[in-house]
Every structure is written in structure tokens, then in C-alpha cells.
Regions:
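Transmembrane alpha-helix/helix-exit interface in multi-pass inner-membrane proteins
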Residues: 260-291
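Short, Lys/Arg-enriched N-terminal segments with co-localized hydrophobic residues
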Residues: 51-72
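Interfacial segments of alpha-helical transmembrane regions
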Residues: 240-271
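Membrane-embedded catalytic cores of phosphoryl/pyrophosphoryl-handling enzymes
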Residues: 74-85, 296-411
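Structural signal for the C-terminal ends of transmembrane alpha-helices
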Residues: 96, 142-157, 232-243, 337-343, ...
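Hydrophobic cores of alpha-helical transmembrane segments in multi-pass inner/ER membrane proteins
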Residues: 132-146, 222-235, 330-334, 383-396
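N-terminal transmembrane-helix/juxtamembrane module of multi-pass inner/ER membrane proteins
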Residues: 68-144, 155-226, 272-278
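Hydrophobic alpha-helical signal peptides and transmembrane signal-/tail-anchor segments
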Residues: 2, 24-40, 47, 51-55
């Protein structure tokens, strides 16, 4: 009977032509699924479902308000943003019941081990977070080049009541150019810092997994690699047309805003829940996994025990929920905004829509294999990243549309 009801609701959604009625049917469908999730999880999932539905409803309202005003918003159909969200919520429901069992089945760890010897898991522990730093660094390079190119634009002489600009105004223009150049250089320094953090974290994970120590040469090589990557990024951007750079600025805004919001939420939730990692229980020979808590429960025992201290563990073991690696990998979702900014062929679009989510899923799976996170940890990180991306994309594209209309009006 449950599946017949689902089928009838889905049929009504597809057959309804009126947008408002379709939203009503869709809301009812989501609430029905939420009610089912609440029942199977004994009401413990209720609060989370309500929050997610409210966020989804907000996104739908934004789309309704700007429908017809923004051509991009017409492409954001219901299935585009709702289907992945519903799937992730369903995964959270599954994780609420079988989180520990799934980790026991997938984690490649023996009792007493903290770092898994699994090559797949180790590989993505090293490179999993790289996208957030590389994309943010490249976005700052875009801003730097955009600011620098403004100083190269020809100055147009203006008149007011038959009088041209005075020498004083020309001197002000020179000061403005200097300020722009200083700003461009500052952005390059910050971009280089992001690139350096990417290499630093990658090397740190490698050293940690192999129980090695760093040295001055490694630090120097990281700095040189970051400078070289920044130089390459700027060289590529300077070879592009001014119009392309202007469009890439919107991509940079989406990338930086999405990454900042996602990681701020994820890092803010970690100390609130203080969830113990699966591999921390394995390292202390806790075969009963007595330290396990469900994702919706706060861990009251968030201080290191004697056994954990003797095992060489740190307070990082209490940062399981949500997954930082998965949140960092979720920054690749900003690449999905490129089809809205540039005209691209179908092959490129398909590659973006397949490879970006696939990378996030692979990183999430690798974190479970390493015993660093549970299914609910990585799923929540994906959900937060996806919601943040949709909200930032919607707002940014609306602002871009208004800005474009204003520019065309001034012409």
C-alpha cells in the first residue's frame, strides 16, 4: 500500500501542468516521505527532516519569485535540486538505523589500528580535500586578474557642462590604479596561500600515514609549488579575453561563497556533536564500540581517556560528524555553475554532471573505508554542501541577471 501511494503521488506531480499545484503535490510527497522516515527511526529524525524541508521550501520560493525574470532559473527544474536532496535524506534515515553496522562492514581496520592500510582509502585521505583549496586559490587568481585588467582599460574622457576633467582628477585616477594594483597583488598572495595549504595538507597526510617527520626542504618545496601554480593560473587567465574574465568572476563568487559557507557550517557542527570516530574505537581495542553515538546525539564524553592517550590519539578523534573531507570535496559542485555562465556542448555538461558528484561520492566512500567517518557523517556533509551550493547559485545568478540588465540599460 505504501508503494502504491508513492506511485499515485508521483503520477500526480508529473501530470500537473500548473507550477503552484505541482509544488503543492511535491510538498505533500516530501512530507509523506518524511513521515515514513520519522516512523522507521522512532521519531528521532523529525527535527532534521523539518529543517531540510524548510530549506527546500525556501529554495522553491526563491525560484518562484524570480521565474520569468531570470533565464537561468528556468533551468533549475524541480528534479535538478530535489532528487539528490531526497536521496541524501533517505541515506540519513538508513544511517540512523545502521550506521555502526555499515562501518563494521566497510571499514578496512583491525582492532588496534588507527590508520587503515587500504591504498584506496589512503589515496583519498591525501587528495580528498584538495578541491576546496585549489578552487578557492584559482578563484582568487580570477579576482586578481580582473582587478588588474581594470587598470589596463582605456580611460574615457568625460565632460560636464562643456568642461573636461582637470589635472587633479587625473592624479586621482593614478592613485586608483595604484590601489587596484596593490589589491591585485594582495589577492595573489592570498591565492598562493590557498595553494600552499593544499600542498601542505597533502604532504602532512602522507607523512602522518607513514609515520614520518617533515623538514625545511619539504616546506620550501611546498612554497615553490604554490608560487608556480599561482603563476600558471595567472598566465592562463591573462591569455583569456576580457569578457571571459568578467564571466569567470561570477564563478569565483559562487566558488568562494559556497566553500566558505559549507566549511563554516561543517566545522561549526563538529565541536557541538563531538562524535567519536570509528577508527578511534578500533585503535583502543574497543570491540564492543561502547563509545559509539548516533549522529543526532551529542557525545557527553568528549575528553581523552587514558587508553586513547596511550594510543597516541588527539582531540581530533572527536570530529567525526560531519565529514570535513567530504565537505571539501563538495566544493567541486561549484563547477556545475559553468554551464549557466558559458555556452557548453552536451558532452562537457554530461562530464561535469557525472564526474563532480562521482568524485564526492568516492571521497565519502573512502572516508568510511578508512574508518574516519560513518555513513551519516559523509551524507550530512554532502547535504550541507549541496544545499549551500543551490542557495548561493540561486542568489548569485539573480544578482548577475539584475547587474546585466542594469549594464544594458546604461548602454
Amino acid at each position: 500500500m505504501f508503494f502504491d501511494t508513492i506511485k499515485n503521488i508521483a503520477t500526480n506531480i508529473l501530470q500537473t501542468k500548473n507550477l503552484k499545484e505541482k509544488y503543492i503535490f511535491f510538498d505533500f510527497f516530501l512530507f509523506f516521505c518524511a513521515f515514513f522516515c520519522i516512523i522507521i527511526t522512532r521519531y528521532q529524525f523529525c527535527l532534521c527532516i523539518q529543517v531540510f524541508l524548510q530549506l527546500l521550501h525556501t529554495i522553491k520560493l526563491i525560484k518562484t519569485i524570480y521565474k520569468g525574470k531570470n533565464l537561468v532559473m528556468k533551468k533549475l527544474n524541480i528534479l535538478y535540486y530535489s532528487l539528490p536532496m531526497v536521496c541524501l535524506i533517505a541515506l540519513m534515515a538508513v544511517a540512523s538505523l545502521y550506521d555502526l553496522q555499515i562501518s563494521k562492514a566497510l571499514a578496512d581496520l583491525d582492532l588496534g589500528q588507527y590508520y587503515s592500510p587500504n591504498f584506496f582509502g589512503r589515496l583519498f585521505e591525501v587528495i580528498g580535500e584538495l578541491p576546496v583549496y585549489l578552487l578557492c586559490g584559482f578563484s582568487l587568481c580570477i579576482f586578481s586578474v580582473w582587478v588588474y585588467l581594470k587598470t589596463k582599460q582605456p580611460q574615457i574622457a568625460t565632460t560636464y557642462k562643456g568642461k573636461t576633467k582637470t589635472d587633479t582628477s587625473k592624479q586621482m585616477e593614478k592613485k586608483t590604479k595604484v590601489a587596484y594594483i596593490i589589491l591585485a597583488c594582495f589577492l595573489l598572495v592570498v591565492a598562493t596561500a590557498f595553494y600552499w595549504v593544499a600542498f601542505f595538507k597533502m604532504i602532512r597526510y602522507i607523512l602522518r600515514l607513514h609515520n614520518l617527520t617533515t623538514n625545511a626542504w619539504l616546506y620550501l618545496s611546498q612554497v615553490l609549488a604554490a608560487v608556480l601554480l599561482c603563476y600558471t593560473s595567472v598566465s592562463i587567465l591573462l591569455a583569456m579575453k576580457q569578457q571571459t574574465i568578467n564571466t569567470l568572476v561570477w564563478f569565483a563568487i559562487i566558488t568562494l561563497a559556497t566553500s566558505a559557507l559549507t566549511n563554516a557550517l561543517v566545522q561549526g557542527l563538529k565541536p557541538i556533536f563531538s562524535r567519536l570516530r570509528y577508527r578511534a574505537m578500533s585503535a583502543t581495542y574497543d570491540s564492543t564500540f561502547a563509545g559509539f553515538t548516533n549522529w543526532y546525539q551529542r557525545n557527553p564524553n568528549n575528553t581523552l581517556t587514558t587508553a586513547q592517550t596511550n594510543a597516541g590519539l588527539s582531540s581530533d578523534i572527536f570530529k567525526s560528524f560531519p565529514s570535513g573531507h567530504t565537505a571539501g570535496a563538495a566544493s567541486v559542485l561549484s563547477l556545475l555553475s559553468l554551464p549557466y555562465l558559458f555556452k557548453q556542448n552536451k558532452v562537457t555538461k554530461i562530464l561535469l554532471y557525472v564526474l563532480c558528484p562521482l568524485y564526492i561520492v568516492v571521497v565519502a566512500f573512502a572516508r568510511i573505508v578508512m574508518g574516519a567517518h560513518f555513513l551519516s557523517d559523509v551524507t550530512m556533509a554532502m547535504l550541507i554542501g549541496y544545499i549551500c551550493y543551490l542557495v548561493i547559485l540561486t542568489v548569485t545568478m539573480h544578482i548577475k541577471h539584475k547587474y546585466t540588465l542594469k549594464q544594458n540599460t546604461n548602454l
